Amino acid sequence: MEKIKQIIKKIPILSDIAKPIYRHFLGRKLNPTYWISEIVRKPNAMVVQIGSNDGFHGDPINVLLKKNSSWKCLLVEPVPYLFERLRQNYGNSARFKFVNAAINDGETAKFYWVDQSAKQHIPDLPWWYDQLGSFNRDHIKSKFNGVLEPYIVSRDIQGIRLPDLLTREGIEHIDVLHIDTEGYDWKILSQLDLRKFNPTIILYEHIHLPIQEKQASIQFLKERYLLYYLGQDIMAINKRAYKAELLTLYTLRCKE
């Protein structure tokens, strides 16, 4: 791939033609929605999403749930106003379960997020500012040179462990597990019993993980899964899954 890129760069006409094609191809390669739709072929797939936000902005699962009318999903979001948006965006279909909770070790803990009034006072905030929910206040404070600090709010939340949540909600199998929790991803993923639940795809955010936790997550999964970097995420594809050894994904493989 690198050799091809170098050859194209040396020929201006080829470069002008190839650049948009390459960008389109790379964009598809980095899009988890594309790969989930390619690999998960079950008509009645079960999705578990931890950190659902509003179920729309920047959500790789939303379009799949709308396209596949028999897919079911457990959607978990701790921030109250985002949870209400989440319910509104998906409606009252029986195939969706909504849980307003945070996944941790089961203890009561203070959870922090950005008040929605921040956008009124700082209009140029990016659309994803309200995705900054965390058990770590400093994680939010560190964003945008600290301008969000006056708008950080908190609430004591009764946490729940992932196994307890799955048992309580009657989840017996998982086809797709998506975790997006601002640096808490490994702590949640590590609670998954891979002997009981063996998802076809696990998608989680690595960008905010300490290097030790990122490496631990890879070690945890690599026996059963092929691991790929998709931008800020790692996508784990079960080795037994359809098209698990996709050649077009090879260059994105995790090497740790």
Residue locations for each model-derived region?
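Phosphate/nucleotide-binding beta-alpha loop and adjacent structural elements of enzyme active sites
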Residues: 1-256
